[in-house]
Amino acid sequence: MSEKPSLSIMHPWHGPILTQDNYESLCCYIEITPQDSVKFELDKATGLLKVDRPQKFSNFCPCLYGLLPRTYCGELSGKYSGEQSLKENIQGDDDPLDICVLTEKNITHGNILLQARPIGGLRIIDSGEADDKIIAVLEDDLVFSEIQDISDCPCTVLDMIQHYFLTYKASPEHLIHGKPAKIEIVGIYGKKEAQKVIELAHQDYLNKFCREKTTI
């Protein structure tokens, strides 16, 4: 008699192994692609990809965008972001760490796992909370895999990513009248700093969800 197939599905946040080589290669869960006119996000309770909202304005995410499994922006992440940005009372945003993945391939849908190498990141403060965006390249990508650090990345690519995150929540009225932005990019950092940010978010995850507070 054949075995019954398993009906359980691995939760994209809690199931996959983040890294097996000290943050040189990362497992990434992709939520949004450049083709999406709807903002999708992982439903943390169920592990299903859900519609968050239609994209309000004309800008689209210029890269694959998602989260790093087994990361959580909590106390350690918030404290470190505040120290590095010289700002007080910065908290973690209580979400998985976000990641942007560069590739020349046309990946047209999310809800997938892929392997990518971190090359740097954006230190972002959103309404007083740490909201860093790790930037990575798809492993074995024919174009972007040559990039080893953020300093190797074309300025035009970084400009598009920064512009998206600075404006995707802003209304035309907000921009026309120059109202203070809730989102602030306070720094751009390279690979080693990105790995530090990932490590702290991984430790925050262990502190939050694992009974034994493991040191990594």
From Swiss-Prot:
It comes from Chlamydia caviae (strain ATCC VR-813 / DSM 19441 / 03DC25 / GPIC) (Chlamydophila caviae). The lineage of its organism: Bacteria, Pseudomonadati, Chlamydiota, Chlamydiia, Chlamydiales. Gene3D superfamilies: Inorganic pyrophosphatase. The keyword Magnesium applies. GO terms for molecular function: inorganic diphosphate phosphatase activity; magnesium ion binding. Pfam families: Pyrophosphatase. This is Inorganic pyrophosphatase. The keyword Cytoplasm applies. Its EC number is 3.6.1.1. Homohexamer. It comes from the Bacteria. Catalyzes the hydrolysis of inorganic pyrophosphate (PPi) forming two phosphate ions. GO terms for cellular component: cytoplasm. Substrate binds at residues 39, 53, 65, 168. It catalyses: diphosphate + H2O = 2 phosphate + H(+). Belongs to the PPase family. Mg(2+) 1 binds at residues 93, 98, 131. Keywords: Cytoplasm, Hydrolase, Magnesium, Metal-binding. It is an enzyme of class 3 (hydrolase).
